[in-house]
A protein has these predicted regions:
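Functional-site microenvironments in short loops/helix caps that host divalent-cation chemistry
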Residues: 1-89, 100
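Disulfide-stabilized, aromatic/cysteine-rich ligand-recognition loop
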Residues: 41-43, 66-146
């Protein structure tokens, strides 16, 4: 969730990274569903649609004591009022839920050289070559290098 917030803010300090009508699809647009990406203005990091359009899944749990495995959703959606399309607003749902106003953003940290690989996520040129050579179903989650 913290990574999502950092990316969505795009280096700004406010609840939004620009005039909402220029950066997000909300209920004010009277839409029947989500819109194609990148039709509104990006933030300073070059990211589009971090607010409005669809809520974005985060890996963090919403409140484990109360909701168990529910995961955090951020950003607001195309059918939501302006107040919910702010960086600080959060919602949650079960990880296997199917909802029309939620999606996900594929994100990846920087790729390390083999010398810089610290065992964290295993992202390096060597790790990527190894994963590309796997035949058949890909392993779920982190793939250790053997």
């Amino acid at each position: 969730e913290a990574e999502w917030v950092h990316g969505s803010m795009g280096g700004t300090a406010g609840a939004r990274h620009g005039l909402l009508s220029r950066v997000a699809w909300t209920e004010d647009d009277d839409l029947a569903g989500p819109q194609p990406s990148a039709l509104k203005d990006p933030n300073a990091f070059g990211l589009f649609d971090t607010l409005g359009n669809v809520w974005e899944w985060c890996w963090d749990r919403l409140d484990p004591a109360r909701y168990g495995d529910y995961r955090v959703l951020k950003g607001g959606g195309w059918a939501d009022p302006e107040w919910s399309c702010r960086v600080g607003v959060r919602r949650g749902n079960a990880p296997d839920a199917r909802v029309e106003d939620a999606g996900f953003r594929v994100a990846r940290g920087p790729v390390a050289t083999d010398d810089e690989l610290d065992g964290g996520q295993g992202w390096s040129e060597r790790a990527d070559r190894h994963r590309a050579s796997i035949r058949g179903p890909l392993p779920v989650g982190w793939t250790p290098l053997t």
